Every structure is written in C-alpha cells, then in structure tokens.
Amino acid sequence: MEALGARGALAGFLRALCVLGCLLGRATAPPSPVIKFPGDVAPKTDKELAVQYLNTFYGCPKDSCNLFVLKDTLKKMQKFFGLPQTGELDQSTIETMRKPRCGNPDVANYNFFPRKPKWDKNQITYRIIGYTPDLDPETVDDAFARAFQVWSNVTPLRFSRIHDGEADIMINFGRWEHGDGYPFDGKDGLLAHAFAPGTGVGGDSHFDDDELWTLGEGQVVRVKYGNADGEYCKFPFLFNGKEYTSCTDTGRSDGFLWCSTTYNFEKDGKYGFCPHEALFTMGGNADGQPCKFPFRFQGTSYSSCTTEGRTDGYRWCGTTEDYDRDKKYGFCPETAMSTIGGNSEGAPCVFPFTFLGNKYESCTSAGRSDGKMWCATSTNYDDDRKWGFCPDQGYSLFLVAAHEFGHAMGLEHSQDPGALMAPIYTYTKNFRLSQDDIKGIQELYGASPDAGTDAGTGPTPTLGPVTPEICTQDIVFDGIAQIRGEIFFFKDRFIWRTVTPGDKPMGPLLVATFWPELPEKIDAVYEAPQEEKAVFFAGNEYWVYSASTLERGYPKPLTSLGLPPDVQRVDAAFNWSKNKKTYIFAGDKFWRYNEVKKKMDPGFPRLIADAWNAIPDHLDAVVDLQGSGHSYFFKGTYYLKLENQSLKSVKVGSIKTDWLGC
C-alpha cells in the first residue's frame, strides 16, 4: 500500500476513522450517566411534541390547542395513520410523531392542495441551485433526474434541467430558517418540503442539509485518483484478511483515507482516495483546488475547515494561504469519518477518545438517553467537550426527492402507507410507484402517451402495487408470528399487528419500518423466545434481528442452519413451548432445530403427515401463542388449532373472522 500515490501532503491529519455501523466502544466500560451535551437540542416532551406536530400538520392552533381541541385533532391524526383513535398520547401515537417525515401537512388519500393547483403545461423545467456536501454533485444530479422520471413514466409530464435563470422548480438545500418562512428542525424530524405548482415559489423543493443524505444504505463515497477514479467505495471490503466498513488509512504512512472499489482488494487491487479537503473542495470560486492550511481569514489563522463568516453552517476553507488577500475559497467535502450535528461543525471522529474517564475505540451511545451513536472530535471529551453524531444509513435523496416532486406536481399526502406520497419516510430498496400514487397523478395530468392503451371497455389495468385490505380481500399471509408479545401478520411489504387475536390489528404498516433490511416478501418468520430474537426466511437465506437491529453477518444461507442444499425456501417455522425446539417446515417435510446447541437434531427431516395430526403439507405459518397451551397452523384463509400436550386438533376456523376481527 505504500506504493499508492496521493497528491500533496496532509500534515496533522487525524488518522482515526468513524466506523459506519457505529459499534459500541469498550464493552467493559460501566454504564454511564445521561448527560447534557453542549450544542445538543433537548428532546421535546410528549405534550410539546404533540402540540407542535398537530399544529404543523393538522392545523391545530398552537395558542389554542387546548385539551379538548387537542383530543379531537389527535383522533384525526390517528385515523390518518391507521392507529387506534383513542385521542390519547399513547405509545404508538408518540412513536409515529417521532418518525422522520416530509414537512408538508397531511391530507387523506391522494387529495391535492387547496384549489387543486397543477401545471398548465407538460414541459417543466428545474434548476439545482445548491448541493449537499454529503454526496458528490454527479450523484445528486442523478438522484434528482431519477426522481423526476418516477412521475414522467406515468404522465405526459417531461422534465428538463436548466443551469441559469428562473426554472419552474428551484431545488436547494438549507438548514433551519432558509428563507421561505418554513424552517427545518435539525437532524431527523422534518426532511424536506415542497410548494404546490404556481408562480414564485410554486414547485420549489427544499431539503434539510442537517440530514445525512445518501442513497438509503449508508454513506455514498465516490473516490478520487488512485486507479479507480470516479468509482464508488465498496463496503465492506477486504484488505489483509480484515473487513473494513469505512474508509481507512491502514497501510499508508501519509494519513490519506482510502477504500477499495471491489470487495477483495488483495485480489483486484482497485482503490481510490476518499473525499477530503486536502484533495479537493466543492463549489466556491477555486475550481476544486484543495484547502491550504493554515490560511488567514479576517486576520485569524485557521488550520482546518471552518464555518466562520457564514450563517448557513457550511464548512469552508481558503485555497491559498491568505484568503483576505486572494479571496479564493471552496466548501469542504464530507468524508466517511465526518460527524453530523453536535458542536464540532462536521469535524471527524478521533479514536480513541476519553469520556467520563473511560476510553472508547469507536462510536458509542454512552451518556445519551436516545441511543444515538456519537463520538468525540478530540482525544478527550472531558477536557474539550467537542462531539458529533456518527454517520448512519442516512436518508435516500432519490426517495425523498421523488416524494417532494410529487408535491411540486400538485399531490398532497396519501393515507395509503404503501404510497410514495405517504408522509413518513421509509427506505424501500426496490422502489415501485404504487397504484395510489399513479391514480392521484393521472387524475391531474392523465396517463403517459408512451404507455399502451386498450381501446376496449372495462376497468383500467392496475399499473402499480396495491396495498392489501385484510377484511375485503381473501389474503394468504406470507408469515404470522408472535414477536415481543405482539402478533404480526406479513403480506408482501406490509404488516398488521395486534396483541389479542380477534381484535382488528393495527395497519397496514411497512415491514421496513421495523426491519429495514428485509426483502419485500418473506416466506416464514418466528421468534426464538430464549434470546428474544426474530428470525425471518426469504428464498434460500435467513435474517436474525435483535429488536430492529440486524445481527452482524446476516443474511446467511439456509445451509448454515443445517438444512440441505436442495431446500431453496421455507414454508413456515415456529418455536414450540412444549420442548423449546424450533420446527422448520418445507413442502411435506419438517426439521427440528436446537436453539441452545445451534444445530439440527438428528433423525430429521420427517414427513409432516407422520408426526402432526391432521396438519397439511405446504403450510403458510405456524404460531405457538405464549401461555395458551395451543399452536396454530395456517394454510390459505383457514387455520387449525392444536392442543400442545395431546397433539389433538381441536378447531378449524377462519383467519379473517377469528384472528383479524373482520
């Protein structure tokens, strides 16, 4: 690696990196007290949050949102999100209010802004005024172009970019109050907002630059120089037998951070340098020249990027030694080790660092009540009190932009949780525009002339996925499981949840809200109660979660459980309270798995018909309800109830009637 070349030198460069995924620091450190971090925004109380939320999104007047008005407005909000309409600030309501979302108000279905504004032309122009330092300009340009294409694919609308002058849709990034009277709120919370079609600010779309903008799966790092210039880092990558999940300076003596652009660097040798102000700057007037440290600004010497002289919080530097004389500057790019928020102006993590007398080698949640991962930006937080949040998965600029551009076309928020125009952000890996979105936009502009039309009569064909309705449709669920005391019903990318069978479950909700890494459709699911972990099966792989956190190393192949290679999918699985063993069903066979020994029991597989009384082959799901003494086997729209001790079948019933409260 010493042979890798780099432009210039980086004196005093901090070599520690903030590892993506942010594992806890020293496991041996005792629990730390919760402290107040300087520069941190104190979380709102539930009541403060509710008043602000209902005022912003449901029109409850902030100065007169008293208990009676609050209760009535709260029921409207709960109805919109499919929550129990209690009028109380219960846990599910507060959880919904705290989720990241669009800053526009909520209106049911695919309704439009007041007076249903729309563009009176099909040729729409847009202009990107500013960029986020989180992504390189090419990635931002591509994300916005793909977001517009979401709508042009299903309408006659056509979008073209201009680089000067006034466009129909002006796109920019900003922080807090950014000039339109609708301030953002720092990291998380409000992600973006857009104005309805019209003159002036009509159609304009703004994105909160206190968020970490990615493509939804962690920082997107495009390398410079090396032998893979312009390609993207591949995380994790393998170097000297070790996996790296972020840029590293390992193997170098100059402190420059690098990454491999393929998984196996030792095999492929493809690498580049990660963005850093010593390599290049963005914007400004220096044509991408790197920072020059130290540089002078208003008589003061700076040895790192600064926000001094700016009101927008963006980090910049001089590209000559004297800015006062030369007036040459550029904005500092975000690196794979930059922090977010806090009080360090995006400075990188420094490892190890000392916090309350303990040493941490990586990001930690110590000292915080919200579980957010953070790091110090000096070697000793106790002395310097400088810190920031560690990078997480971030928010998909493409998905958020596609949503906001829907507003810019005239669409309001949808009550359909499967719609792009639903107000709450949920990352979707293989995005498809829903039928609700298509119906809404085509009500305004009509269908795309490029789509084939049927001259005959009959219903309009469904173009996008439709959110299922459990009581009006005969749904065959992909999986059913009791997880942390709640019963979850899975169908495609949706779930419904309830505590008591027979009560109408809450939902539909998106699976990705709870388990974001899962594919759009699962085959089976069960909870391993001994460890309180949820296990999901899809195709020839399985996933293991602790709460909503995917265990390291997953997904894994079914063969690692001890299933034979010819088993390419699982029908159902459950942990039986009678013997604490897990049963896995596929076709007409089943296997028994020992959760303690982590291996299959000998003597399996066996035929279902030989061991289970009246249980059919090719099951859909199995659940052993905690404390009930019964297990339930689901197939199609019916279930069979089995008495655990005697193995007698005691009931056959309708899922819709007995489980869904229809």
Curated annotation (Swiss-Prot):
Pfam families: fn2, Hemopexin, Peptidase_M10, PG_binding_1. It comes from Oryctolagus cuniculus (Rabbit). Residues 228-276, 286-334, 344-392 form the Fibronectin type-II domain. Residues 414-662 are annotated as: Required for inhibitor TIMP2 binding. It is found in: Secreted, Extracellular space, Extracellular matrix; Membrane; Nucleus. Disulfide bonds join C233-C259, C247-C274, C291-C317, C305-C332, C349-C375, C363-C390, C471-C662. Phosphorylation on multiple sites modulates enzymatic activity. Phosphorylated by PKC in vitro. The propeptide is processed by MMP14 (MT-MMP1) and MMP16 (MT-MMP3). Autocatalytic cleavage in the C-terminal produces the anti-angiogenic peptide, PEX. This processing appears to be facilitated by binding integrinv/beta3. This is 72 kDa type IV collagenase.
